[in-house]
Every structure is written in structure tokens, then in C-alpha cells.
Design a protein with these regions (language model features):
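Targeting-peptide/extracellular-domain and disordered-appendage signature
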Residues: 1-259
Length: 259
């Protein structure tokens, strides 16, 4: 299995890149684009060389306002916060062209939109973020903010969404994450977590999370790890599985003062 990643920058002029919110949502950068087809339905297209991706995504659950009605504090100061909106359950169908072969693809996607004035507070060096689709129809998003002394910041938080769509906000004391294994990057020499046990005692949720591919490090403008994971565990004593995405920053270098 291979992991591929790309990065582009462009000025928002001459039609090269841009975004609209009305009358419908659209954002594009050259031939990478996401456009709204109808209420809750989006068309995603991207091309890199001879490879391309063409997907239709349908929001079957609706938006989730993370944190305090969409306001997500990341530290004690007023500026250390973000506005954070998710669409965690997007039914996805489409086509993928890779190495000259076309594939039909389907599954579930998760869209996050987060924007802020500052990513980290003083003393914070990075974050670990998890977004998981579970086989019982529930979803889990949690993130931990790591401090220079190795401790977890109390502003770490998350959201658990039941199979019937009820949302539960999680504070830092509501979940536990233990690193079970690590992986050292041959490119950056950063040492990343590579397996986790994640527990949410309030909903009797116990999960084991492992990457699909060990090397999902992105060596771009910022060096960090972000990639696909698979999940096994239990809720209320019943077995479940799942898939998701994990983002790990601050392991190759501190993210402090990077934004």
C-alpha cells in the first residue's frame, strides 16, 4: 500500500483559486474543487498528473457545532480558540483513476471546517486529532493538545455522537488515550504514535486504533502525520469496528508559532 500527498498554493485572482458561499458553496484551486450540487450534496474533483478523483458526497446527518455551539477554546486566552463545524457522516460514491486503472469507490467521508486566529497557546507544541466512524452508526471526534513538558492540556476536548444523532460534548477528563506503539520517520526522524487505546468511560466505549499504513507523514510546508486508521473495540460490551482519520502534529518539530 502506498500513501500519496500533494500541496498547492495559488493567489485568489484570474480565476486560479477562490471560494463562494452564495448562492451555493464552491471552493477551487485550479482543477481541485468542491462544489455544492444541492442542499447537503457536494461534488469533489481533483487531478494530479494522470491520476484523478471524482466523488459525490451526501450529508445524511447534518452539521455538528463542535465545542460551545461552534466556538472551540484551545487555551485560556481569548485569541486561542477556533470556530469548528463538522459534517461527520457523508455518504460517498464515485471514481478513482490511479496508475492507469479506474476504480469505483464508495464509503463514508467526514468534513471539518475549522478557522482561528491562533492554533496553539503558550506552552503547547502540537495536537493529536481523531475522527472515527464506528460500525454501530456512532461517531467520535477527540483531540488532545500536548504541552512542552509532555502533559496534556486541559483544553483538550471532543464530541461523541450516538447512532440516533444525540451529541455529547467531551472534556479532557471524559476520555483517555494511551499510546501502544510508535513509528520513526525515515524522512524527518520524528517519532509518532502508531497505535492507541482510546476509552470513553461515560458511554462504555473502548477502542484499539491502528494505522492502515505506518508511513502517512506529510513532508510539506509543515511536517506532520495524517492518515487513515482502522478501529476495533466494544461499546456496552458489544463488539464494534470502524475506520477513521488521525492527525498528529508537533512530533517532527514544534507547531508553536507556525500559524
Amino acid at each position: 500500500e502506498d500513501f500519496h500527498f500533494y500541496e498547492r498554493f495559488e493567489r485568489g485572482s484570474a480565476g486560479l483559486a477562490g471560494a463562494y458561499g452564495e448562492p451555493v458553496f464552491e471552493v477551487w484551486l485550479h482543477d481541485w474543487s468542491v462544489s455544492q450540487v444541492d442542499e447537503g450534496i457536494y461534488h469533489l474533483q481533483s487531478r494530479q498528473g494522470e491520476d484523478w478523483l471524482d466523488l459525490e458526497l451526501s450529508d445524511i446527518q447534518g452539521r455538528v457545532l463542535q465545542g460551545q455551539a461552534g466556538y472551540s477554546p484551545k487555551g485560556p486566552d481569548v485569541g486561542n480558540a477556533s470556530y469548528y463545524i463538522s459534517q461527520p457522516r457523508l455518504e460517498t460514491n464515485g471514481s478513482l483513476m490511479y496508475a492507469g486503472e479506474q476504480f469505483a469507490v464508495s464509503g463514508w467521508a467526514w468534513m471539518d471546517h475549522e478557522f482561528s486566529t491562533s492554533a496553539l497557546a503558550g506552552g503547547q507544541v502540537g495536537w493529536d486529532w481523531f475522527a472515527l466512524h464506528l460500525s454501530d452508526g456512532s461517531e467520535l471526534m477527540v483531540y488532545t493538545l500536548r504541552r512542552q513538558d509532555g502533559s496534556l492540556d486541559p483544553y483538550s476536548s471532543g464530541t461523541y455522537i450516538t447512532p440516533d444523532g444525540v451529541e455529547f460534548s467531551l472534556n479532557s477528563g471524559d476520555f483517555e488515550i494511551e499510546v501502544d506503539d510508535t513509528w520513526r520517520s525515515p524522512h524527518s526522524d520524528g517519532v509518532y504514535p502508531a497505535s492507541w487505546t482510546l476509552n470513553v468511560p461515560a458511554v462504555d466505549l473502548e477502542l484499539i486504533i491502528k494505522p492502515h499504513v505506518a508511513n502517512q507523514e506529510l513532508t510539506l510546508s509543515f511536517i506532520y502525520w495524517e492518515g487513515a486508521v482502522h478501529v476495533n473495540g466494544t461499546r456496552d460490551g458489544s463488539d464494534l469496528a470502524g475506520h477513521g482519520y488521525v492527525e498528529l502534529t508537533g512530533y517532527a518539530h514544534s507547531m508553536q508559532n507556525q500559524f
